[in-house]
Amino acid sequence: AHMDCTEFNPLCRCNKMLGDLICAVIGDAKEEHRNMCALCCEHPGGFEYSNGPCE
């Protein structure tokens, strides 16, 4: 099943780091900034963002 993601946050982007998919402020992967972003959800077309759980 693909991830149904909503609530796009333009300040954040999905990044692959250390094998993990995280959502971080663009240009910044600091730990304290990751939680400021929505969840990073993967789906067949790429990545989107969700303020709720990836489904």
From Swiss-Prot:
Coiled coil: none annotated. Keywords: Disulfide bond, Protease inhibitor, Secreted, Serine protease inhibitor. The keyword Disulfide bond applies. This is Trypsin inhibitor. One of its GO terms (cellular component) is extracellular region. InterPro entries: Kazal_dom (IPR002350), Kazal_dom_sf (IPR036058). It is found in: Secreted. It comes from Halocynthia roretzi. GO terms for molecular function: serine-type endopeptidase inhibitor activity. The record marks K16, M17 as: Reactive bond. Disulfide bonds join C5-C40, C12-C41, C14-C37, C23-C54. Residues 1-55 form the Kazal-like domain. It comes from the Eukaryota. Potent inhibitor of trypsin.
